[in-house]
UniProtKB/Swiss-Prot annotation:
This is 5-methylthioadenosine/S-adenosylhomocysteine deaminase. Substrate binds at E99, H191, E221, D306. The gene is mtaD. Its cofactor is Zn(2+). Belongs to the metallo-dependent hydrolases superfamily. MTA/SAH deaminase family. The lineage of its organism: Bacteria, Pseudomonadati, Thermodesulfobacteriota, Desulfovibrionia, Desulfovibrionales. It comes from Lawsonia intracellularis (strain PHE/MN1-00). It catalyses: S-adenosyl-L-homocysteine + H2O + H(+) = S-inosyl-L-homocysteine + NH4(+); S-methyl-5'-thioadenosine + H2O + H(+) = S-methyl-5'-thioinosine + NH4(+).
Length: 441
């Protein structure tokens, strides 16, 4: 007698991302209570399982949802505002001044827009750092996406918290509030070494240990950051963070561009996770993170878009393609990063970055966080190698379905939890608000 499950999905091709990197053709998977309970040939699944709902995606490729390993999702309101500038000028002349005027409502609508873009292009989880992070979480709950995040922590007052202590207390309250929410996870988010002090970073470590929370920080993003750290503390950023105790297996480091081989070995020895943000680093001319050297040292590396202000999109398919091509040309080696390696970064590496190892793979016992792509699109035919197409040919617009914990959040042009037209109208108001604030600079 067949067992009953909630949903069965049939697909032309299933990219599992399991340990063997199995690609299953004419396969199916069964889902119950948000988790995958079976995966295999269509005939086998149909003979053992009956479903309340069946999705026949016969022309489609099903794969794990992508994981954005570093972003500032609410910064969609900055998209296209300040381009073609170096990082420090970009931050000090545009980003920080306008952020002083932020309101929770601006963050709410801008976050929801960011999540809409993510879901539309196949992202099911992200690692976020911003202000009014409780509102960022509320928008994530509205959209249904997974969000790991926390309040940005600075030594100086921010628009949402007057002190680092206040930001840390807020972080602790959010951790308690969302402790039972499977899609919301809290991290301790010190912004960087140049916007904090040793005392602030030590306080961040204490809270992370006290509450058993991961820690997420921008590190070694530019040579300017390195110079600032050397001038202030007589150490390069990696050594500075090592001596403070920042570097642990529960720490995710965003960017990690201006590093030497000795520092990479140090990061590997401490088990840190890296978030690579190639588009942002290219746009701001921050440099190129030595990803091949990291992989040689068995460092876990995720892939992130950074914020829409410095990318200018939150599309992980575009990020994968840029990542692969950047390293080929930078290292003058077409094998510097293989397509499979880049896909691993956007799935399994992302799961490591948000410290949720069950994500990034389609297998029994794992959450049903998945996406389906229409492989009949002109740019995806013919298909000899699915992994090649995912990295070098897919744009993200082929995404037909996005699912988190077995729940469909995007399906064939429609978001299931919110009205996109209403969101678009709200963003027009946000755009006017930004223009008003620009006049104050």
């Amino acid at each position: 007698m067949a067992q009953l499950c909630d949903t069965i999905i049939h697909a032309h091709c299933i990219v599992t991302q399991n340990k063997e990197r199995v690609i299953l053709y004419n396969g199916s998977l069964a889902i119950t209570s948000g988790n995958i309970v079976a995966l295999g040939p269509k005939e086998e699944i149909c003979s053992f399982w009956d479903a309340k709902e069946t999705l026949d995606l016969c022309n489609m490729l099903v794969m794990p949802g992508l994981i954005n390993a570093h972003t500032h999702v609410a910064m969609t309101f900055f998209r296209g505002l300040a381009d073609d500038l170096p990082l420090m000028e970009w931050l000090k002349s545009y980003i920080f001044p306008i952020e002083r005027h932020l309101t929770p409502e601006t963050v709410r609508w801008s976050s929801l827009l960011g999540y809409a873009e993510m879901l539309r292009t196949g992202t099911t989880a992200c690692l976020d750092m911003y202000f009014f992070e409780d509102v960022v979480f509320e928008a994530a709950i509205k959209a249904g996406i997974r969000c790991t995040g926390g309040e940005s922590i600075f030594v100086f007052p921010s628009v949402s918290c007057d002190t680092a202590k206040t930001a840390l207390e807020h972080t602790k309250k959010m951790a308690e509030l969302y402790s039972d929410n499977t899609r919301i996870n809290v991290v301790v988010n010190p912004h960087s070494v140049y916007t904090t002090t040793p005392q602030v970073l030590s306080q961040c470590i204490e809270v992370a240990e006290e509450c058993s929370l991961p820690l997420h920080i921008h590190l070694s993003e530019t040579t300017t950051e390195t110079q600032i750290c050397l001038q202030k503390y007589g150490l390069r950023p990696v050594s500075y963070c090592r001596d403070l105790g920042i570097l642990t297996p529960r720490t995710t480091l965003a960017h990690v561009v201006d590093v030497n081989l000795e520092e990479l070995t140090c990061l590997a020895e401490h088990g840190c996770v890296i978030s690579h943000n190639p588009s942002s680093n290219m746009k701001l001319a921050s440099g190129v993170s030595p990803i091949p050297e990291m992989i040689k040292r068995n460092l876990s590396v995720g892939l992130g878009t950074d914020g829409a202000a410095s990318n200018n999109c939150l599309n992980m398919f575009m990020e994968m393609g840029r990542c692969a091509l950047l390293h080929k040309v930078y290292w003058n080696n077409p094998t510097a990063l293989f397509a499979q390696t880049v896909l691993d970064m956007a799935t399994l590496g992302g799961a490591a970055a948000i410290h949720q190892p069950k994500l990034g793979v389609l297998a029994p016992g794992h959450p049903a966080d998945l996406i389906a792509l229409d492989m009949s699109m002109p740019n995806l035919q013919p298909m000899f190698n699915p992994i090649s197409h995912l990295i070098y040919a897919t744009t993200g617009m082929e995404v037909f379905l996005t699912m988190v914990e077995g729940e469909i959040l995007y399906y064939n042009g429609t978001f299931t939890r919110f009205d996109y037209d209403s969101l678009s109208n709200e963003m027009k108001k946000v755009s006017h608000w930004v223009k008003e604030k620009l006049q104050l600079l």
